[in-house]
């Protein structure tokens, strides 16, 4: 299969003007700066390999400046004493600005990440908007409690009055990945600022453009200088410096389990708090009573959406034996019908993966599966002028110990396995180091809820997959992470509980 990809240009004036700058800057303490070293990194369009522009190659010195700015802002009364309703208005204003610039942001995300324009326009940027709106409300719901105690040794005639107060944890370092940049960034920023923290954001070096544009909107929204800071650069330099920094009180990270473990090690120096949303190898389970007109495209989209670059992607497909061949054939047919192309082409259904490095990694997994005896039913090719397109791939004849079954591929590759009964599929689904998500496809609600209870996963969808909302917690069990993003409890990730006990 060949693939012709033409270079397409953004249609919005905002995106064209943004790219025309060539070299971008970082935001530190309310000022736009180059890296201390003066070094830059090229940022590429993964569909074509063309250079879109340059970003500062921030490193330890830049992180030091950003953390210092965030600490000053945290201690400054202009932010520290801001009322909850005032913080709420700032977050709501940010949502309005994202909405007003949605088309521009969608084009920048498509060019920088490769994803089809419609993914940003109708899914991810609206998702980011809703994060800011939701946590604008949560900013006014932070409260402590009064506590009746059983203390009985206070002075005669005195009483005990005890209560808890919730206080912002301090300076937060947020490190976000390249697969869904703007919505994952919003999932860190919105609850942290709702809680009253300040932040240093380190976006992925492959996809920093929308983070820079978002930083501009943060300034326009009216956040005080230093409340939000942006440092771009390589993960092993800027990201590592942020994770280890003694002036950072908390790290909020989304990314691979391997990097999550490195961040855990780096945080030891000052025992900073962590939330980690990490990798997954999520099962999609189809029972023989499922509505296959719903289930077949559902499980196909569970893995092929965003070229499989989704932490909760349904990358392990388990199908009851009676319907296994029919479902695999249907998913294969669906895969072959998907149109690959440039993200700005409105007919594109599947864009490239984020980089040649990632494409080579995915292709390596497919080759490993073949070597171990698996059968590629459809797909498996690596295409395009930059070698960054991966054909949607369906693999069968797999065994539980194979690499393609056990390891997170993070591409449009699904491995399919038959099963006989609920006990067997429970064992198969839970036979993983991960525990991020799962889905069950069935017309029997008893079976659905029995499996939902049995699966060791942070989220279980029934007759759907990858349904997100700002109100719904997302996070994993086992090696898929610590803590939860989204939902009202996400604000607690950024709060300390103080106990006050008084004799009155």
Label each residue range with its predicted role.
Residues 1-48, 73, 134:
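Hydrophobic face of amphipathic alpha-helices that form TPR/SEL1-like repeat modules
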Residues 50-53, 248, 285, 339-340, ...:
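Conserved C-terminal structural/oligomerization subdomain of aldehyde/semialdehyde dehydrogenase
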Residues 52-143:
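Glycine-rich loop-to-alpha-helix module at the N-terminal edge of alpha/beta enzyme cores
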């Amino acid at each position: 299969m060949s693939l012709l990809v033409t270079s397409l240009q953004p249609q919005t004036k905002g995106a064209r003007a943004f790219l025309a700058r060539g070299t971008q800057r970082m935001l530190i303490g309310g000022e736009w700066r180059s890296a201390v070293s003066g070094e830059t990194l090229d940022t590429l369009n993964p569909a074509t390999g063309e250079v879109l522009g340059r970003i500062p190659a921030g490193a330890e010195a830049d992180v030091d400046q950003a953390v210092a700015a965030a600490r000053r802002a945290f201690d400054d009364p202009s932010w520290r004493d801001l009322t909850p309703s005032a913080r709420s208005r700032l977050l709501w204003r940010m949502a309005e600005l994202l909405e007003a610039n949605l088309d521009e942001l969608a084009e920048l995300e498509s060019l920088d990440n490769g994803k089809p324009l419609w993914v940003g326009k109708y899914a991810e940027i609206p998702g980011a908007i809703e994060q800011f709106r939701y946590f604008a409300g949560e900013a006014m719901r932070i409260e402590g409690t009064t506590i009746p105690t059983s203390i009985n040794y206070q002075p005669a005639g005195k009483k005990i009055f005890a209560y808890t107060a919730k206080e912002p944890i301090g300076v937060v370092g947020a490190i976000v990945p390249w697969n869904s940049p703007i919505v994952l960034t919003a999932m860190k920023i919105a609850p942290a600022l709702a809680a009253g923290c300040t932040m240093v954001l380190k976006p992925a070096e492959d996809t920093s453009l929308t983070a820079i544009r978002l930083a501009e909107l943060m300034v326009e929204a009216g956040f005080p200088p230093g409340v939000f800071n942006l440092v771009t650069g390589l993960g092993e330099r800027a990201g590592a410096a942020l994770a280890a920094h003694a002036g950072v009180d908390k790290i909020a990270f989304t990314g691979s389990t391997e990097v999550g473990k490195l961040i855990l090690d780096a945080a030891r120096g000052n025992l900073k708090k962590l939330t980690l949303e990490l990798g997954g190898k999520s099962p999609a389970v189809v029972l023989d009573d499922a509505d296959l007109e719903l289930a077949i495209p559902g499980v196909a989209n569970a893995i092929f959406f965003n070229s499989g670059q989704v932490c909760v992607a349904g990358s392990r497909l388990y199908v009851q034996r009676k319907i296994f061949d029919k479902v695999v054939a249907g998913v294969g047919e669906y895969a072959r019908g998907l149109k690959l192309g440039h993200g700005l082409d409105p007919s594109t259904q599947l864009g490239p993966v984020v980089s040649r490095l990632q494409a080579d990694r995915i292709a390596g997994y497919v080759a490993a599966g073949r070597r171990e005896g698996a059968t590629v039913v459809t797909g498996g090719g690596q295409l395009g002028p930059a070698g960054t397109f991966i054909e949607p791939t369906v693999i069968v004849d797999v065994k539980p110990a194979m690499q393609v079954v056990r390891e997170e591929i993070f591409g449009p590759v699904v491995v399919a396995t038959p099963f006989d009964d609920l006990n067997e599929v429970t064992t198969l689904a839970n036979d993983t180091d991960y525990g991020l998500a799962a889905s069950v496809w069935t017309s029997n609600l008893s079976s659905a809820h029995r499996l939902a209870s049995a699966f060791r996963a942070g989220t279980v969808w029934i007759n759907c997959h990858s349904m997100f909302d700002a109100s719904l917690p997302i996070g994993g069990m086992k090696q898929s992470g610590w803590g939860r993003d989204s939902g009202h409890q996400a604000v607690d990730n950024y709060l300390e509980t103080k106990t006050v006990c008084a004799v009155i």
